[in-house]
């Protein structure tokens, strides 16, 4: 890895954070390619050491030579210990820090400590940080690296959920933070009434944000438009834009890139199967799941929903986080059906029962999908956690190819 990464001609980006890494990293890669650059990228989201090594090996020729101007590498937070000792990133994009996989990461402070230790080992690495996240912003300020910020300075949507908020207390002094508004989870405009810690000035500020059938916002007098749903995708797009601009590009081809961008990795991936529109998305922690639900419920037409929950090692065995998700938001009139599947389908069904949401149980994921395509309303959303993602995507690709 050290040998191959040293052959990157210009700069190396790493993308870290709890949610949005894969989408942000792939958009960043596509944006750099739109600027005419050759880029190495771990597109599938394989973000531990083996996945990072594989991205560089697959990008190399048989001679061991790498032909790349840039590298865009998504890195699992805990894996930075192994990756940062072998490559020297020029930029780090920090998306957010939420509670995730408690039995693997433990408390969020452990993740922050790992990141800070590794960031300090690369003191000249510039951090492109979500300034609306008090945890990420504190980390960027505290580690001593140069940093720029991106964020959304005005409230966009009314925050009605009773979400678990991770960054409630000031990391500097322990005082409870005061928020003038929340976007979602702990993202918003915050300040500490005791020590003065506050949301930093935002360098890349999204204004006039619209989140309807598509996303639109203005940054640096440039109107950005993307055919995506979900408020959280404003942050993903904004992070990629901030990365490209920080690297010195004018981002003149950014909207063109967004029009052509196709994730093809189970993140908001769309399929058309026998007349049914299918959207597959990853939901692996409370903050991410709540944003997924909000995006699904933006669609006012009747819909079927399949939720697939596993508890394999990569998911985390502890699925108590399901009780911190606002599943009561699925109580709208336009829900035709909800089916639960996966290893922990019984737990998922119980969780829905506690908020009076009726559901059907089908242990086999393919059977569940075939049933909804066969007798559903023609509009299907499939929400899965990590180890269910690739198997479910393969099923959907297979069904899409059937005549």
Q: Can you annotate each of these PLM segments?
A:
Residues 1-151, 159-161, 165, 169:
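Phosphate-binding loop of NTP-binding sites
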Residues 74, 95, 128, 236, ...:
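Residue-level signal for inorganic ion chemistry
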Residues 86-96, 187-201, 228-259:
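A conserved, hydrophobic alpha-helical segment in the catalytic core
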Residues 153-215, 227:
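Cys/His-rich short segments
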Residues 162-168, 228-239, 264-266:
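Short glycine/threonine-rich catalytic loop with a Thr-x-Gly-x-Asp
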Residues 197, 210-212, 243-279, 283:
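Gly/charged, well-structured mid-domain segments that form the phosphate/adenylate-handling core
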Residues 264, 282-361, 399-402:
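Active-site beta-alpha connecting loops in nucleotide-dependent enzymes
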Residues 382-403:
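Glycine/aspartate-rich loop-and-adjacent alpha/beta segment that forms the canonical ThDP
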């Amino acid at each position: 890895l050290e040998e191959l990464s040293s052959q990157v001609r210009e700069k190396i980006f790493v993308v870290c954070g709890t949610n949005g890494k894969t989408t942000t990293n792939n958009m960043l890669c596509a944006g750099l390619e739109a600027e005419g650059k050759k880029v190495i990228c771990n597109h599938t989201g394989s973000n531990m050491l083996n996945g990072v090594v594989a991205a560089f090996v697959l990008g190399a020729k048989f001679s061991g030579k790498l032909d790349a101007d840039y590298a865009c590498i998504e890195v699992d937070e805990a894996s930075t210990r192994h990756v940062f000792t072998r490559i020297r990133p020029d930029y780090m994009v920090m998306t957010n820090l939420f509670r995730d996989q408690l039995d693997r990461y433990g408390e969020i402070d452990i993740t922050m400590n790992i990141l800070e230790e590794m960031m300090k080992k690369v003191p000249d690495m510039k951090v492109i940080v979500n300034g609306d996240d008090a945890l990420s912003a504190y980390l960027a300020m505290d580690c001593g690296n140069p940093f720029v910020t991106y964020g959304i300075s005005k409230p966009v949507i009314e925050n009605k959920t009773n979400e678990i908020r991770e960054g409630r207390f000031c990391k500097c002094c322990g005082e409870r933070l005061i928020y003038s508004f929340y976007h979602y989870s702990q993202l918003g405009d915050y300040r500490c009434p005791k020590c003065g810690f506050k949301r930093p000035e935002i360098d890349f500020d999204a204004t006039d944000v619209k989140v309807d059938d598509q996303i639109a916002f203005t940054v640096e007098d440039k109107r950005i438009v993307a055919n995506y749903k979900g408020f959280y995708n404003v942050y993903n797009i904004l992070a990629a834009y901030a990365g490209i601009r920080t690297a010195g590009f004018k981002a003149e081809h950014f909207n063109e890139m967004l029009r052509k961008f196709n994730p093809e990795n189970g993140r908001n991936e769309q399929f058309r199967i026998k007349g049914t529109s299918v959207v597959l998305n990853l939901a692996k922690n409370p903050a991410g799941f709540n944003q997924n639900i909000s995006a699904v419920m933006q669609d006012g037409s009747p819909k079927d929903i399949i939720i697939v929950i596993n508890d394999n090692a990569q998911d985390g065995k502890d699925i108590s986080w399901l009780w911190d998700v606002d599943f009561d938001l699925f109580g709208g009139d336009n829900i035709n059906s909800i089916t639960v599947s996966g290893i922990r389908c019984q737990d998922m069904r119980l969780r829905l029962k506690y908020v009076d949401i009726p559901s059907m149980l089908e242990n086999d994921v393919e059977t569940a999908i075939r049933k909804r395509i066969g007798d559903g309303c023609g509009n299907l959303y499939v929400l899965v956690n990590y180890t269910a993602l690739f198997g479910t995507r393969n099923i959907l690709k297979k069904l899409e190819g059937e005549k």
